[in-house]
């Protein structure tokens, strides 16, 4: 199986879907209820505030919830495979290592991200329906603003009138960063067998804190905006932005390569903590 086959990949993806679909639906239902009750509590605790401010607080909550949910889902992509019966069946699938690897990564990246978003939309809708029926409130959804927060800045006009090159570089750096973060959590999911999300997140936070400290001490600019009092003057793209636009994709490629290399070495019996036993290499 040296060549990639979309037919084998489709069958492997279908197997991954069938093995995880029930838990996906259960988690989606649970997430929807969490969002509903959390939004109701936020609304109740901030009754004296304006609707705009309450929606802003809810938007912050669901954004953090979404990011944590996606990170946790990626970290758990090989959780079921770590169970011996599932691991044996998965390793015996009539597909190449690349096809099996991509089927798992694609499912837990796309399917779980979509379902987490749907759970947020359902929970937000339940809150609007409940408050409309009980309190007579108007229907104010947080979803449009939530979607706008992930849109590239060059797709809409800014009140600061940034140049197109500035907006494009922002989008490039953000995209590169997202791919690097995804590859980092994918590597953690492939390498670790226990406390994957916690250990990967702690390592990620340490790297970001170290990077921030280095940048702060070296005074390297990422993006700059010059103001004179309350008047916006100009903007610029710093050297660090160009460096990150090149380095982050390279680091992401290394992470994906390392993750796939570990995946190819999956054994039916391995140690308790990792999927990579360096003593056997």
Predicted ranges, named:
Residues 1-87, 97-281:
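Hydrophobic alpha-helical transmembrane segments of membrane proteins
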């Amino acid at each position: 199986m040296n060549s990639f086959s979309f037919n084998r990949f489709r069958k492997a993806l279908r197997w991954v879907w069938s093995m995880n679909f029930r838990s996906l639906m259960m988690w989606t239902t649970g997430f929807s209820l969490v969002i509903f009750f959390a939004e109701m509590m936020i609304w109740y605790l901030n009754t004296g505030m304006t609707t705009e401010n309450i929606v802003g607080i809810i938007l912050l909550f669901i954004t953090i919830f979404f990011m944590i949910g996606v990170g946790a889902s990626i970290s758990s992509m090989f959780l079921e495979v770590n169970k011996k019966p599932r691991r044996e069946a998965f390793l015996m699938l009539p597909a190449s290592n690349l096809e099996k690897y991509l089927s798992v990564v694609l499912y837990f990246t796309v399917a779980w991200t979509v379902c987490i978003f749907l759970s947020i939309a359902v929970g937000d809708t339940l809150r609007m329906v409940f408050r409309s029926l009980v309190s007579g409130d108007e229907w104010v959804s947080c979803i449009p603003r939530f979607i706008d927060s992930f849109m590239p800045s060059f797709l809409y006009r800014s009140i600061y009138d940034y140049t197109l090159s500035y907006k494009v570089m922002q989008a490039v750096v953000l995209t590169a960063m997202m791919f690097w973060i995804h590859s980092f959590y994918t590597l953690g999911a492939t390498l670790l067998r226990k406390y994957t999300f916690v250990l990967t997140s702690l390592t990620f936070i340490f790297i970001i804190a170290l990077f921030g400290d280095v940048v702060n001490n070296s005074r390297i600019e990422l993006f700059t905006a010059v103001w004179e009092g309350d008047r916006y003057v100009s903007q610029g793209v710093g050297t660090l932005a160009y460096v990150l636009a090149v380095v982050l994709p390279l680091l992401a490629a290394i992470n994906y390569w390392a993750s796939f290399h570990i995946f190819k070495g999956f054994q039916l019996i391995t140690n308790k903590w990792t999927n990579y036993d360096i003593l056997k290499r």
